[in-house]
């Protein structure tokens, strides 16, 4: 005598089938971007050159995705973005840039007390092709930063503590 599947098993099978159908439909959606570039812009409140626990993320900072042809250096694509309340920007891109070098670059800070561009933190490279072994469309970019005009009072003690922690590791 054949056994009747338990209701939980049947429900799980139906849910699994629906998930597969919906994911296939979403994968074929021509309106979805090929790539989603995401990163953050911060204010280096200690002028340390890196993110600390007193770093502030900047809402309303302007960034630009620039893709330049590898051989000629000609600008092939530029897309502007703006950070949200958490200092996070999201830029959607519809096509691949296999022959390009793409970087997100700082454009402007809305904070007058934190608008000095940090060398080496003013741009972040992103790979925008599928031919590099990355199948996910989300492409995270390294954080971009500006220096605060005057370090916060807590910074001297914080940087001393960080230096002391480094000495303990040796």
UniProtKB/Swiss-Prot annotation:
Domain of life: Eukaryota
Glycosylation sites: 53
InterPro entries: Allergen_Ole_e_I_CS (IPR006040), Pollen_Ole_e1_allergen (IPR006041)
Cystine pairings recorded for this chain: 43-114, 46-155, 67-102
Cellular component terms (Gene Ontology): extracellular space
Signal peptide: 1-27
Alphabetical UniProt keywords: Disulfide bond, Glycoprotein, Signal
Tissue expression profile of the protein: Pollen.
Entry similarity comment: Belongs to the Ole e I family.
PANTHER family, A to Z: POLLEN-SPECIFIC PROTEIN C13, PROTEIN DOWNSTREAM OF FLC-RELATED
Protein known as: Pollen-specific protein C13
Organism per entry: Zea mays (Maize)
């Amino acid at each position: 005598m054949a056994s009747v599947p338990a209701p939980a098993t049947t429900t799980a099978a139906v849910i699994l089938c629906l998930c597969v159908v919906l994911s296939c439909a979403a994968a074929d959606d021509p309106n979805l971007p090929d790539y989603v570039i995401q990163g953050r812009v911060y204010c280096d409140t200690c002028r340390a050159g890196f993110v600390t626990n007193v770093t502030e993320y900047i809402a309303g900072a302007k960034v630009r995705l620039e893709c330049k042809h590898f051989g000629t250096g000609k600008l092939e694509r530029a897309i502007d973005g703006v950070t949200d309340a958490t200092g996070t920007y999201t830029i959607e891109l519809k096509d691949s840039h296999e022959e390009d070098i793409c970087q997100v670059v700082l454009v402007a800070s809305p904070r007058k007390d934190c608008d000095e561009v940090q060398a080496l933190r003013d741009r972040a490279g992103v790979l925008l092709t599928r031919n590099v072994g990355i199948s996910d469309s989300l492409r995270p970019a390294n954080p971009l930063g500006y220096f605060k005009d005057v370090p916060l009072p807590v910074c001297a003690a914080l940087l001393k503590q960080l230096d002391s922690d480094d000495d303990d590791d040796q």
